[in-house]
Amino acid sequence: MMRPVVVKEKRVNESQIHAVEDEVRQAKTMDRDIVTHAMKQSFAKLNPKVMIKNPIMFVVEIGFIITLILSFLPSSSSSVPGWFNITVSLILLFTVLFANFAEALAEGRGKAQADSLKQSKKDVFANVVKENGDIVQVSATDLRKGDIVIVKQGEMIPNDGEVIKGLASVDESAITGESAPVIKEAGGDFCSVTGGTMVVSDEITIVITSNPGESFIDKMISLVEGAARQKTPNEIALNTVLTSLTLIFLIVVVTLPIFTNYLGFQIDTAVLVALLVCLIPTTIGGLLSAIGIAGMDRVTKFNVLAMSGKAVEAAGDINTIILDKTGTITFGNRMAHTLLPVGNETIEQVGKWAAISSVLDETPEGRSVIEYVQTKSISYNREIAEQGEFVPFKAETRMSGVDLQDGTKVRKGAVGAVIEWVQSQGGMIPKDVNQKADLISKEGGTPLVVAVDNRIYGLIYLKDTVKPGMRERFEQLRQMGIKTVMCTGDNPLTAATIAKEAGVDEFVAECKPEDKIAVIKAEQDKGKLVAMTGDGTNDAPALAQADVGLAMNSGTTAAKEAANMIDLDSNPTKIIEVVGIGKQLLMTRGALTTFSIANDIAKYFAIIPAMFTLAIPQMEALNIMKLTSPLSAILSALIFNAVIIPLLIPLAMKGIAYKPMSSNALLSRNLLIYGLGGVIVPFIGIKVIDMIVGLFI
């Protein structure tokens, strides 16, 4: 009997292995295609109209053109051999190509994602309901905002919209990558649907909320392709500083011949070009665009759609995070934690009636009561409950239960509501009911009273469990200097208990959606940058007010339009990871800038002695690396300057490993690694290259 089972398992495992192998092969093929395309784009980007957008690399390209021209214009006054000019020009060409390759590679990853998104934008037709009730089939491209469309099982949702009738399971894997379908229904915060997703069961009627070219997928394609990418304020500021440095060094190099003529010797033009390229920050200049694009790419890979690079950078500077309790800090499903009998009742009696009141209750709380009673092996008569008439929970009554066929009425619900119900039937209230209810509230739980007719048997302790690891994550945020504020509709007692258990810094109890705006503004008035999550229409104003607003993809259109980031997985806790990605982006840019500028120190010690030693013998003292000759020193510095760019591409694309710590500790760590390392690595690299170059000249 066991053999068929074993064979079946083996086949399943083999098919899974083959599927994984296919995915790996596809990923490798995609990577090869991206690299091949990036190599082609490296040459296409040599167009001066494109290069001028990066002033640093544009200067290098001009240097390449000058030295290339000099290679074909022999001069009797030149102090360097003819091959030197062509060698310098080739090194400068590869320097520009490597920088272009870094940018094209980052862009290529985005375009690959865009291509996969375009797969969902096939020729889709929609069943439009006209004003007279007729149903007409039209192309999705002809849909306009306000059109009413019916989508049946197996059909593609033609454009973004909101469900106004019906309920259906929707496959959103084309957008989110998650294979499990999600429920979409009319009303509430889960009525929003996205064009390109598919209805897998039932039928829904939707109202279109976007015109062609304005849909969610259109925005995603535009963003990941980089068409809508604008440089962030920090990126612009850094680019301005680097361009200013380049201009200063350009003036220095251009005026240098005046100084050397005064000393009685001349410097060859190719050497001056080499000096300029070694002086300007070419490393960070060549990688700056790639770092920004890769930062957006990392967020996208995390299934978060950032509406701009500014939003990602702002996430890295966040000081305060506003978090909802339910679904973010806690699981959001209150589960039966324990049973508390009152008066002279027993736990078996409480469990029996609690279970009977919950047999027909399909809510998570009702299911958890049944599961708890079963785990405690408490017996109850399920059959009499199933034969009874279920009384659903209502906001007015604040309780639910079942009316049995023999006339017995079983109820469970809010303390005050059940006490009032029992008293209306002439029942007496045990003295310890309120005492035990307060005890449950103090521990952060929710008390439900169980009563049968005019008699209270006890309480159900419902507990909304804090998600595992939240305290540790909040501690990491605290180390990063980020304050966490929990907003909840719970009473202050329950809120304080949950806040203490989770480890948040502050909490706001009995918080209404409009109160969140006040909390955000109060933090911003202190000069803080604030992040928050939300999914409902009532969250939209606060999402718009926050510096980083992360909306859930399952939420309303209003929430997604107000936010500057959208989480495709609809996981509110992801805001913590988004902050980490933002900090990683800022750190990567800062660290590579530090490394690039520190690099120049070693290049100075290589190229400056090589230029001036013949005229000023005392400059030989600066040749601390003992390089072979002036020409080999210049070429070695240029070669290192070129090859360091492709060597740093993986770091620019992946980002620097980020560990939560204080700003001062982070600064010290990066200065040690990328500042000191930026000085040491070029000394070693230039010396090794010089030893190799010295063998050929």
Curated annotation (Swiss-Prot):
Binding residues annotated for Mg(2+), in chain numbering:
D535, D539
- What's one Pfam family the UniProt record gives for this protein? Hydrolase
Q: Which reaction does it catalyse?
A: K(+)(out) + ATP + H2O = K(+)(in) + ADP + phosphate + H(+)
Q: How does it sit in the membrane?
A: Multi-pass membrane protein
Q: Which UniProt keywords apply?
A: ATP-binding, Cell membrane, Ion transport, Magnesium, Membrane, Metal-binding, Nucleotide-binding, Phosphoprotein, Potassium, Potassium transport, Translocase, Transmembrane, Transmembrane helix, Transport
Q: Which superkingdom heads the taxonomic lineage of this protein's source?
A: Bacteria
Q: Which family does it belong to?
A: Belongs to the cation transport ATPase (P-type) (TC 3.A.3) family. Type IA subfamily.
Protein name from the UniProt record: Potassium-transporting ATPase ATP-binding subunit
Instruction: Name the source organism.
Output: Bacillus mycoides (strain KBAB4) (Bacillus weihenstephanensis)
What taxonomic lineage is listed for the species of origin?
Bacteria, Bacillati, Bacillota, Bacilli, Bacillales
